[in-house]
Structures are given as C-alpha cells and as structure tokens.
Swiss-Prot record:
It comes from Rippkaea orientalis (strain PCC 8801 / RF-1). Pathway: Isoprenoid biosynthesis; isopentenyl diphosphate biosynthesis via DXP pathway; isopentenyl diphosphate from 1-deoxy-D-xylulose 5-phosphate: step 5/6. [4Fe-4S] cluster binds at C315, C318, C349, E356. SUPFAM superfamilies: Nitrite and sulphite reductase 4Fe-4S domain-like. This is 4-hydroxy-3-methylbut-2-en-1-yl diphosphate synthase (ferredoxin). Binds 1 [4Fe-4S] cluster. GO terms for molecular function: 4 iron, 4 sulfur cluster binding; 4-hydroxy-3-methylbut-2-en-1-yl diphosphate synthase activity (ferredoxin); iron ion binding. Signal peptide: none annotated. It comes from the Bacteria. Converts 2C-methyl-D-erythritol 2,4-cyclodiphosphate (ME-2,4cPP) into 1-hydroxy-2-methyl-2-(E)-butenyl 4-diphosphate. Pfam families: GcpE.
Length: 406
C-alpha cells in the first residue's frame, strides 16, 4: 500500500551541505489504486511484451510483473480488436489474481481505439507526434503560422472526445513525447530539439486544460541521455513559468540491453531524480520485462528515495584486506538479504572500516588475521574467529530483535 513520504528533517539548511533530495511538488494523479506524484513514492512501471490478443499470455505477463514489484503495467493497443481484448484481460485478472493498474499504449490515428480502450484501463498513453499522424512531405520545407494552427485545430478536435471520456471516468492520460517521432510541423518549427519535444507536450496539455482535464502525466523520452535530460529540465522550467504541476514519467527509450543498457538508463533517470525531478520511472531494456524491475528499485534505493532491500556498504578491497572480501560479502548478503530496511557494512580492514560504516546498523570488519569485529552502529560489540563471523552477525541481529525468518 502506498503511503505519503515524510521529508527528512534537515540538520544543516545550507544548500551545499544538504544531502536531502527535495522532490518537485506535483499534483497527484490516480492510476487505479496507485498515485503518481503528490508526494507519493516514485512509482515503478514496465510493459508486457505479449500480444494483447493473447489473453492468457497477457494476464500471465501482467501478473509476473506485478508480483515482483511493477506497480503499473502498460500494454500495447494497435487495433480495435486489441482494445476490446482489454475487457477480457481485466476480467481474467480479477478472477485469477487481482486488479492491476493498466495503461494502454495508443499511437497512429488512435481516436477510436483510445475511446474503446479507455473503458477498460486506468490510463491511456498517447504520443503527440503520432496521435494525429501527418505523413511527412518530401517537398515541404516549412509551415506557415496559418498551416501550423490549422493542424493544431485538427489535433484539438481529434483529441477532445478522448479527453472528455477520461475526464468523465476519472481516469488518467500520459502525454508521452518521443524524440524520434516528433510531428513534422514541430520539426520544421523548432528543429529536432528538446524545445520541439516540450512544445509538443505543451500543445496537448493546453487542449486538456481547455476541457478542465488535468489528470495528466508527462514524459519526454529520447534514446540519447543528454537530449532526454535537456528535455525534462526544459519541461520543468516551462511548467514552472506557466504554473503547471504535472508529474513526470522518466525513461531513456531504446536503452538496449545488458550492462550498458542499465548504465545508460541509470545515467538519465538517476540524474533527474537526484535533482528532484520525476514521479514514476521505467527502465526500458531489450530483455524480458521482468529484468527491468530490479534496476528501477536499485536506482531508487541508491538515491534513498525508496528502501526496498538491504543496503550493503562494502569497500573495494586492497592490500590491507584481512579476509576474502568478495566471498564474505556474498555470504553476508545471502544470509541477510531478506532483512529489508537494514544497512550492513562489510569492511576489509580497520583503516576505513569504522568511519565508512558509521551510518550502518551493523558492521563486519577485519581487525587482525583470522578474526573479525562485529559492530552495532559505531560500537564494537565483539571480536570472533573469521569462520564464525556470519553466524555471529546473525545472532547479534537476532539479539536486537531485528531478525525475521526468510
């Protein structure tokens, strides 16, 4: 169950010494039983890769993601048949599992599809560059203001029925701009730039606001991290100037796979989160969707925004290390990884040990060959033979009443 975050009290209000991440204040947007923004914890999302027409497969994929911590699940809806399949998926989910907050991904000329799927999901994602698709011209090199405005009117008329439907149902919309699919008129007017991405989002926001609909989440994704960072920062600047407080969905699109895909996503998402920007995240990997969820939670844990696992502090090892640090860290982690909320330090020697682990709940430190010292906070509790270290650490945690069985 979601709970509102309580800001940590500042011990030093001087900005250069303030280690607290001060999140941008945003309006709360309900997506099923989950709230994005409004001071709630950063929400984790992903997307199934099953064909939505495969009812059983889609239900299984949604359930797999939700069971490992994916709080909102997105599905692709490229046709009317896919939209209608969402009714069956929802019914089947309720029968075999539970209701899960669902988002429908709607793209090319998607009004009829979006109106149908809005009955069956909690949020509809639209791409401003594709929602009213204009086939690129090979001869055009610019748009006059009149032409620009004429297409804007067409977009408004096409978007209005969906906005009214979502508004009247109390549901949400994500205005999801992608750098790679900006509309031609935006490209000619603003260039292939973060400014074009922001103006594309603002055009759709204004249409929604004109109909008194503000259950909006905004994203401005790009496959290049510097472009993504610039777009979100500019979006925040423009929203602040315009008095807007919409929550932001962060992600680096098409990040790839493996180690680099994870690093690339983290470089973009974590940078913005550290600046207080962002209310929900997705790490997009060219892997099974289940692989994305641990990366999301690791990013949030590393920044101190959500604590969903044990925090381990361990030195990188050097010539002073008095035991096999990598092996011992593995043993400690395997024995204690279920103790969510604890900070445990494993340090190879006395030089850095006590100081670096001062904020940890428990410490495991090499002090002399064949022996290790166990700490509770800054206090050394006992010195024990190395081969008894992990078990003695467990006993210390148990004695403090902080142990739970795996």
């Amino acid at each position: 169950m979601q709970t509102l975050e309580t800001p940590k009290p500042l011990t030093n209000t001087s900005p250069e010494f303030d280690t607290t991440i001060h999140r941008r204040q945003t309006r709360p947007v309900k997506v099923g039983d989950i709230t994005i923004g409004g001071g709630y914890p950063v929400v984790v999302q992903s997307m199934i890769n099953e064909d939505t027409l495969d009812i059983e497969g889609s239900v299984a994929g949604i359930r797999r993601l939700h069971e490992i911590g994916c709080e909102i699940v997105r599905v692709t809806v490229p046709s009317m048949a896919h939209a209608k399949a969402l009714a069956e998926i929802n019914q089947k989910l309720a029968e075999v599992y539970r209701r899960v907050p669902l988002v429908a991904d709607v793209h090319h000329n998607g009004l009829k599809i979006a109106l149908e799927v809005a009955k069956h999901v909690d949020k509809v994602r639209i791409n401003p560059g594709l929602y009213v698709f204009e086939k690129p011209s090979t001869t055009r090199s610019e748009y006059t203001q009149a032409e620009f405005d004429e297409i804007g009117e067409k977009i408004s008329e096409t978007l209005k029925p969906l906005v009214v439907s979502l508004r009247d149902q109390g549901k949400a919309m994500r205005i999801g701009v992608n750098h790679g699919s900006l509309a031609e008129r935006m490209l000619f007017t603003y260039g292939d730039t973060p400014e074009g991405m922001v103006e594309s989002a603002l055009e759709f926001i204004r249409i929604c606001e004109s109909l008194d609909f503000r259950n909006l989440v905004i994203s401005l994704k790009a496959s290049r991290v510097p472009v993504m960072l610039a777009a979100y920062r500019l979006m925040v600047k423009r929203m602040d100037e315009l008095g807007m407080d919409y929550p932001l969905h962060l992600g680096v699109t098409e990040a790839g796979d493996g180690e680099y895909g994870r690093i690339k996503s983290t470089a973009g998402i974590a940078t913005l989160l550290a600046e207080g920007i962002g209310d929900t995240i997705r790490v997009s990997l060219t892997e099974a969707p289940e692989k994305e969820i641990p990366v999301c939670y690791s990013i949030l844990q590393a920044l101190g925004l959500r604590k969903t696992m044990v925090e381990y502090v361990a030195c990188p090892s050097c010539g002073r290390t008095l035991f096999n640090l990598e092996e011992v860290l593995h043993k400690v982690r395997e024995a204690t990884k279920h103790l969510t909320g604890l900070d445990i330090a494993v340090m190879g020697c006395i030089v850095n040990g006590p100081g670096e682990m001062a904020d940890a709940d428990y410490g495991y430190v090499g002090k002399q060959a064949g022996y290790i010292s166990l700490y509770r906070g800054r206090e050394e509790i006992k010195r024990v033979p190395e081969d008894q270290g992990v078990q003695e650490l467990i006993e210390l945690i148990k004695a403090d009443g902080r142990w739970v069985e795996p």
